Amino acid sequence: MENSQGGAKGAQETQPKGTQPKAAQPKGVQPKATQLVVGAVLVDDLRQPMRFLAAQRAYPAQLRGQWEFPGGKVEPGEAPQAALARELREELDIVVKIGVEVTPDTPLSAWPLKPGLEMRVWLVSTDRPEISPGTSHMQVKWVTPVQALDLNWLAPDLPIVRQIIKLMAAGQGKCVQS
């Protein structure tokens, strides 16, 4: 599914391996090196998602107890989707099927986290019925869109939560790449 205003995209324009999309810079400003992070919105069903997994941070102390999407940094030379699969194996001990990418409603190709750090996010699913939090998280839990709004999300993840809720409400739940 393609959404020119952002949202979920199936067919992706692929970046050369090891490169990252760059955010627009004002004229005359040198772009800083950007670290790419990948995140997973683990849904109960890629074809018609009703719930997604929220993960409560265990550390560092200033983020402990806040909720986020599982994921992590892309290593040099690693493709973003390969990094996503690796991070989910490491953090949650799961193998996933990767669905569509969730993009911002802006011209940016990734979600800004903080200066020098941006995140690309995909919907994913797994066949594992039970998911344990691992060492990175205090707990994980399945939430509906309404329940998700009651959680204390990391500030950079809130726009992603809102986009997921918007996509689910709009019935754009067919989240498998074509």
Please provide the spans of the model-predicted regions.
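Intrinsically disordered, low-complexity repeat/linker tracts enriched for polar/charged residues
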Residues: 9-15, 20, 25, 30, ...
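Active-site-adjacent beta-strand/loop module that shapes the phosphate/pyrophosphate-binding cleft
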Residues: 95-96, 100, 105-131, 141-145, ...
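Short loop segments at secondary-structure junctions
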Residues: 44-48, 58, 125-130, 145-147
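Conserved N-terminal beta-strand and adjoining loop/helix that marks the start
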Residues: 2-4, 27-52, 73, 104
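A generic structural signal for short hydrophobic patches within well-formed alpha-helices
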Residues: 74, 148-149, 161
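Charged phosphate-binding loop/patch that engages nucleotide di/tri-phosphates or the phosphate backbone
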Residues: 158-178
